[in-house]
Each structure stands twice: as C-alpha cells, then as structure tokens.
Amino acid sequence: AYVVSDGETTLLLECGLSFRELQKRLGYGVADITACLVSHEHQDHAKAAAQMLKAGVPVYMSEGTAAAHKDAMDAAHLIRAGEVLRFGHLTVVPFRTYHNVEEPLGFLIEDGRTKERLLWAVDTANLGVTADRLTYIAVECNYEESLLNRSDRIPSVLKERIRHSHFEVNDVIKWLHKQDLSGVLTDSRGSFRGLRFGFVRNKRRIL
C-alpha cells in the first residue's frame, strides 16, 4: 500500500494487507483516507478492498478487478483507462497496464496547485503510456533477463510467466528514455530523487 497526500486529500494506492495491518502500518485513520485506488485483482493488491468499503472508504477499481472480488463489486466505483477522476486538488487518470489479469491499471496523479505529477505502475509487463512534466515516477520492475535465464531455482514455467506479466529492468530503461524526465526531482548531486523502482529480488520486495 502507498499513500499520496497533498495535506488535504489522502489517496491510498492498493490495499493488499489485512485491514487491521493497513491501519497499523499507514499511520492514517480510515476517516483520513479520501479514496483507495486498486490496480488489479491479486490479493497482494486488493485484499482489504471489501473491508475498506465497509469502513466507508470509497474504493476505485476496474470492472475486471471488481469481477474477481464479488464482495466488493456492488459498492466499488468502477473506472476505466482514460477516465478523469478528481479528489480535491488531486486529479487521477488511470491508464492501461499489462498483467495476467483482466483490466489492470496504473495511475497518473497530478496536484492541481503545485502541478507535481506522479506516474505509478506495478505488476506490468510493459507500459504504453507516455507522459510529460513528470515529477515522480514509481514503477515496479521484477527481473533482469540474464539473471532469470541463468537461475536454476526457478522452474521454466514460472520463468515464462514472469516474462509475460512483469517488467524487465532493461525494458524499463527503454521506456524511461521515451519519457520527459526534465521535471523529475533531483537531489544536490543531480541524481533522480523523484524516480523510484520497486524491484523484487530473492523473494523480497524492496523500494
């Protein structure tokens, strides 16, 4: 789970922990969360969706994601790629991602006052979206092809599944070359402070 806030509006991206664990880790009360955005149906991203709805938190997901969560489908807000969502001064535009599920989404989030923009995408084999004026980029990449190919601990079937449903490091770099990185925040040394990769290594996710 990730929190995006402008100090007035607080968005929760994903709810893949138990409801109790989410409350403990986030440092936010349920009443402080304006909305929860879910990228896709897998439990590590949507586990607490039904409980969030019961607690009064609006949950937004695609119809494909909702179809896999019958207990959330009736109450969830169904969204599509390209639709414009507004929460206070924050604007969210979902975009298509590529995973082994129905209708997965990533999110482009902009603060209308500061004009800061975040592009956020997890569990995707590729990205077709191109955005300008990005301030922050948070993209999950899961493997490097030569390391995956050499591994004798990962079954061939799983290797193929990884290749077809997750982002490879070099493909992420190619995608980044197509983006406008001129506005991405840098530190005093010129390193990209606004660029973050979620990389899975040795079965542990690090960010």
PLM regions with names:
Residues 57, 72-81, 89-92, 134-139, ...:
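Active-site regions of enzymes building and remodeling cell-envelope glycoconjugates
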Residues 1, 41-45, 92-94:
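Structured catalytic core of nucleotide-sugar glycosyltransferases
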Residues 15-17, 41, 65, 97-100, ...:
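Active-site metal-binding loops of divalent metal-dependent hydrolases
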Residues 83-144:
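Catalytic core of the metallo-beta-lactamase
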Residues 18-64:
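Active-site metal-binding motif and surrounding structural segment of the metallo-beta-lactamase
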Residues 9, 55-58, 179-186:
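A short helix->loop->beta-strand "cap" motif at the edges of active sites that frequently abuts
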Residues 1-26, 105-123, 136:
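Conserved beta-strand hairpin/beta-sheet module of binuclear metal-dependent hydrolase folds
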Residues 131-207:
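Cap/insert and terminal regions of metallo-dependent hydrolase folds
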